[in-house]
C-alpha cells in the first residue's frame, strides 16, 4: 500500500494497520473445539459472499455456524470452538476477523480479494481461493477439515505473524 501511494503521490507515508487488542481475548473462555464446526463471521450482505456459502453448504463435511449479528465476546467464543473460519467475500479490505482467527489459532480459508492477501499467505498463514469459485472453496474446506497437520502448520504460522505484526504492543 505504502509503495503504491508513494509512487502515485510522491509523498512519504507511514502505513499503520488496524491493530489487534490481544488483551481483549483474555475474557474469552477456554472452550472445547467442536468437530468440523465451521464459522462465518460478517454481515449478511452481497459483498461478504454469504450467499455463496449458503448455496454450497450441503456439500461441506461439517456444520457452518453463521455469526452475523452477535456480541463480540459471544462471537469470539464460537470462533474459538470452531475448526475453521470461512471468508467468502467478493470485496474486502483487511478483515479484523481474520486477525482474530489468527490470534485464536483458527485456520482461515478466504477469497483472494482486496487486502486479504496482505495477511493471508496461501499455504503459509491460510488458504486463498479465487473469488466466486464455489468448487475450489468446497474442496479447500473439506480437505482442510481432514488435515490436522496442515491446520497445525497454518495456525502456528498465522499466530506468529499476527503477534509480530498486528498487536498493540508491536505497533506502539
Per-range role (PLM):
Residues 90:
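Aromatic "clamp/platform" in nucleotide-sugar-dependent glycosyltransferases that forms part
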Residues 122-123, 127-134, 143-148:
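Conserved acidic donor-binding segment of nucleotide-sugar-dependent glycosyltransferases
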Residues 31-48, 54-57:
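Conserved donor-binding/catalytic core segment of Leloir-type glycosyltransferases
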Residues 107-110:
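Short hydrophobic beta-strand element within catalytic cores of glycosyltransferases
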Residues 1-26:
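Donor nucleotide-sugar binding/catalytic pocket of nucleotide-sugar-dependent glycosyltransferases
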Residues 77-82:
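Short alpha-helical donor nucleotide-sugar binding micro-motif in glycosyltransferases
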Residues 76, 95-103, 117-118, 124:
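Short alpha-helical segment that forms part of, or immediately flanks, the ligand-binding pocket
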Residues 136, 143, 150-164:
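A short, well-ordered alpha-helix in the C-terminal region of glycosyltransferases
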Amino acid at each position: 500500500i505504502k509503495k503504491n501511494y508513494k509512487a502515485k503521490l510522491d509523498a512519504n507515508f507511514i502505513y499503520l494497520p488496524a491493530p489487534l487488542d490481544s488483551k481483549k481475548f483474555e475474557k474469552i473462555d477456554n472452550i472445547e473445539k467442536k468437530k468440523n464446526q465451521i464459522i462465518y463471521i460478517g454481515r449478511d450482505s452481497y459483498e461478504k459472499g454469504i450467499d455463496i456459502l449458503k448455496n454450497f453448504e450441503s456439500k461441506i463435511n461439517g456444520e457452518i455456524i453463521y455469526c452475523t449479528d452477535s456480541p463480540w465476546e459471544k462471537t469470539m467464543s464460537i470462533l474459538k470452538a470452531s475448526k475453521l473460519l470461512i471468508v467468502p467475500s467478493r470485496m474486502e479490505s483487511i478483515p479484523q476477523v481474520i486477525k482474530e482467527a489468527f490470534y485464536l489459532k483458527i485456520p482461515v480459508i478466504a477469497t483472494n480479494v482486496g487486502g486479504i492477501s496482505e495477511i493471508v499467505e496461501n499455504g503459509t498463514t491460510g488458504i486463498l481461493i479465487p473469488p466466486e469459485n464455489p468448487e475450489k472453496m468446497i474442496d479447500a474446506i473439506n480437505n482442510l477439515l481432514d488435515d490436522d497437520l496442515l491446520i497445525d502448520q497454518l495456525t502456528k504460522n498465522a499466530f506468529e505473524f499476527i503477534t509480530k505484526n498486528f498487536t498493540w504492543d508491536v505497533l506502539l
